[in-house]
Amino acid sequence: MSVCLGVTKTIAVSSLGLYAGLLTTTTLVTASAPIDLLLPRTNENPIVNYFKSIVCSVGKISTVLSGLSTIFFGASYFGSPLSLRHPYLIYGMVIAPISAAYLYGASLFAHRHPSADQEKNNSPSPALDDSTVDLGKDFKHPKITPGEAGKCPFGSKTSIEASSESSRKNCNASIVAHLSVVTVFTILGFVQSVVGLYGEGHFV
């Protein structure tokens, strides 16, 4: 094995290993961090914004590492003699593209097929013209009839918050599940690349 091929293969395997490590860290953080830190919201405090900037930076670094591993695995495979074009180079080359395609497909499917909680939350509210409550010129709160004391015509705030909390938990579980699949797949690809490189150095 020439020095040039040895360098390209080392860079490829190292990049894939760092990529797998970042995916593992991201999965663990996502599983333990509150979903509110991961979803876009308004009026966020500086700590939340700082956390999201870190997540964004990690995503950019992961993209660079995955691109490096794909490029250098491809260069190592197609730049090697036919006798040295081992399958682990092809496997390592397709790890990042398959991972990206899986995450993109999962995200696309989730947006096109919302869950029951999301459909319930996104259901249209009754038109204002159909309301039996006269809001008046200076609206502060709808009128409450004596028979409905203690009830708010806007609905139960607790039930709305519970539904929203359920949606956030489902979203977090879905993100963690998809990240776990990609992480395991990437780690397996990294392990087989290390084994392939180790065996190649000893038996070729």
From Swiss-Prot:
Any single GO BP term: macroautophagy
InterPro entries the UniProt entry points to: ATG33
Localization, UniProt: Mitochondrion membrane
Membrane topology: Multi-pass membrane protein
Principal subcellular localisation of the protein: mitochondrion
Cystine connections: none
Transmembrane domains' residue ranges: 11-31, 64-84, 89-109, 175-195
Keywords: Autophagy, Membrane, Mitochondrion, Transmembrane, Transmembrane helix
Functional summary from the UniProt entry: Involved in the selective degradation of mitochondria via autophagy during starvation and at post-log phase.
UniProt xrefs under PANTHER family: AUTOPHAGY-RELATED PROTEIN 33-RELATED (PTHR37278:SF1)
Family classification: Belongs to the ATG33 family.
Stated name of the protein: Autophagy-related protein 33
Organism, as annotated: Vanderwaltozyma polyspora (strain ATCC 22028 / DSM 70294 / BCRC 21397 / CBS 2163 / NBRC 10782 / NRRL Y-8283 / UCD 57-17)
Lineage of producing organism: Eukaryota, Fungi, Dikarya, Ascomycota, Saccharomycotina
